[in-house]
Amino acid sequence: MAAADDVWCRETVPRVMELVSPRLPQRDACALLAVSPWCYRVLVANPKLWEVLDLREMKNPGDRLISALSLVRYRHLKVLNLEFAQDIEDRHFIHLKEMSGISLEDLEFLNLNACQKISDKGIEAVTSLCPNLRGLSIYWIVGLSDSSIGHITKNCKQILDLNLSGCKNISDKGMRLIANNYQGLKKLNITRCVKLTDDGFQEVLRKCSSLESLNLYALSSFTDKVYKEIGSLANLTFLDLCGSQNLTDDGLACISRCGGLTYLNLTWCICVTDVGVVAIAQGCRSLELLSLFGIVGVTDACLEALSKSCSHSLTTLDVNGCIGIKRRSRDDLIKLFPLLSCFKVHS
């Protein structure tokens, strides 16, 4: 009996833990290390478990990060999540840079969202450690400037996905750095980067022609110069133009050349009329989500046009506040778009 118990503890339980752990949140998987010495050995020896380090919203994230990266098992880390780890500071990244033997060469994605105590110096330090980074999210770190973009473009040459949402001090200078260094960029989010102008962002659109996802939420200063340039992005599938108050039907007609669009948010694009939406209907025949929320210049005519081209694909349609559309009850909309399951994008 004792021998059977010994086999159970030494072999069966660790094997079960090894099978279960990849399906658990990382924090739960880490807790399994304390079950027994045998579980510890088996789990530590599984490299897949240690490709992600999730310190989201944790207390003392800087000290935890330094401790974790000192361990051999995190030598091949691919994803580091520090989102809302608000006590992380420049000094933690600078300390990592100065430590011998610390390398993040395998890191592919870094999430620093809302780490408000990070400055340009912190960005310089952390990006110097991860030259092969492919995705970087620095949402709502309002103190960052174009200097951070300079550090990112200098240290991380392979970025494909860049989220700058809420970085209000980024200017056209930063956009030019992106345009000149990331011509293979796939995803860009510049929500509320309010210092940007047509001139700077046009350079991005001209040089980053592989863009698939573009989020321009709450950027009311751009004009049709930018929107017409978007029409040249042949691979674009996601476009958020919420609050683009200067977008006209002419600009939207150019965007209709993006035939692969599946997501288009035109909420509060107040200059748009049926003319622009009909152009979208004719050019973008694979739309799955479309928001026309708050546009008073559109009528039932644009929905008729959309139903001819997108009834087979559209699952989300928001026409709330579109007072020119008279037949906008759920029943009316489902008659035109049988696959609709969502009728509100914005609450």
Q: What kind of region is each of these model predictions?
A:
Residues V35, K59-L65, Q86-I94, Q116-K121, ...:
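Short, solvent-exposed loop/turn at the beta-strand->alpha-helix junction
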Residues L110, K121, T127, P131-N169, ...:
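Alpha-helical scaffolds that organize eukaryotic protein assemblies
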